[in-house]
Amino acid sequence: MLIATLNHNLPDLTDNLVNQLKRDPFFNQCELVVVDNGSKEQLAKSTTHRLENNVFFGGGFNVVLEYFLSTDHEYLYFLNNDLIFHGPSFLTTSYNEAKYSDATVYSPSVINASVEQCHWKQMWNWGKGLRNVDWVDFQCPLIHRRVLEQIKHYPDELIYGWGLDFYTGCITKQNNWNTVVSDNNTICHLNSQTFKQNKIDIGVSEFCQQADLRMNNFFLNSEFKDVYFELRKHGETYSI
C-alpha cells in the first residue's frame, strides 16, 4: 500500500500525521510519500518529494497518482495532513476492512473539529459498521488500483481538489464497484488549516468560489452530469 499526503506550510501537522501512522505495525509494510506542495516555510521532517510551486490538492493528487501507477501497490491511501486518530491499528483496520468488503474506494467515517459536521452525511459515523455508499468525500480515501488505472489522471479543471471525489464516484458507479464508509474506523479532521492559520496565498472565499466554479463547469459539460447530481443528492440526503 502506498500512503501519501501533501504539505503546504504546515510541517508540524504533517509530521504529526506520520508519527500517528507509525504506531501501526502495518506501516512497515507500506511505502510513504510526503509531497511538499510549494511550501515557503520550513519543510516537514517526513518530506520525501518536493514541488517548487503550490499545485493545490488536485495537482498534488495527480503527482502522487502518476507515481503510484509506476509501482505495483494494490492500494493508495491519500490522507489530508490535518487528520487526528488514536490507537495503533488505523492502517490495519482500513486495509482489512477494504479487503473484507471488496471496496474499491474506502474511507473511515469523519468527525470534523468544528461546530458543523461534514456537509456530506454519508461520511458521518452512524454506528452501523461497514456501509455501502455511492461516493466518499476525499478527506482520507483508500483507493484500489483498478479504479486509479481507469482514471489515470484527474481532469486538470479540478486542480483545486473539489470534484476529485465526485469524479471517482462517477467511475465506481459506472463500473458497479463497491464504495464503503466504516463506522468502526473514525478520524477527526481539523479542517482547512492552511486557511485558518493563514498559510496560503489565496483567501478562503476566493478559493471556494474558484473551486466550486471549476467543479460545476467541468461536470455540467461532461458525460457525468446526471451522475454528478445524483451523487450530490446522495450525500446531502443520506440517512439510515
For the regions a protein language model found, what residue spans apply to each?
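Glycine-rich, basic loop-to-helix element that forms the pyrophosphate-binding segment
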Residues: 52-68
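Conserved donor-nucleotide/metal-binding helix-loop-beta segment in metal-dependent transferases, i.e.
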Residues: 89-105
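Short, well-formed alpha-helical segments that are part of the catalytic scaffolds
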Residues: 10-25
